[in-house]
Amino acid sequence: MKYQLDAREARVIGCMLEKQITTPDQYPMSLNSITTACNQKTNREPVTELSESEVQQTLDLLVKKHFLRTLSGFGNRVVKYEHRFCNSEFGDLKLSPAEVALVTTLLLRGPQTPGELRTRAARLYDFSDVGEAESTLDQLQQRDDGPFVVRLAREAGKRESRYRHLFSGEASDAAVLEEESVNDNSHPLAERVEALETEVAELKRQLAALLA
């Protein structure tokens, strides 16, 4: 895959995608506004404290990679940046509004479940239900020019698997294999739980008969 963003690059791109939707009157963005967005305390995982010089270095790298372009002159007192990451006349990556919302939220907060993504992406796109979020994740996984997301191993005690973006490289085989292993082993456990529930119900019935 041609997208190989490091952590800072992913944070910058995620912030610019987010602000383009939520505060379009303040987009394109200056170095100061991008730094503020990167270090935002809400909707960020992890929370960072990047300096302007660190963000500037990242912006310069993204410009060289053709993921950003600078806007200056014509009355602009400061250099501003706009992304060319997706849905740009300069790039090939075209994403639907729902796909943009999920990709943005994954770039900003790392691996998340479909339920978490639906809730956290609400300001970017109004998913009708979790099913629509899952369907969009499937589309991102199955695109001919992708995949752009992958389902990770289900964490112990969790009902949903998390998804992560692939714009920073492929997920480890171990994560996918662990997911498959969890699924393979889930049937015997489910059967055992069902048997125990049946046994408890029978004991309750017998106890009720004795007390009658």
From Swiss-Prot:
Pfam families: DUF480. Coiled coil: none annotated. Belongs to the UPF0502 family. PANTHER family: UPF0502 PROTEIN YCEH. This is UPF0502 protein ECA2523.
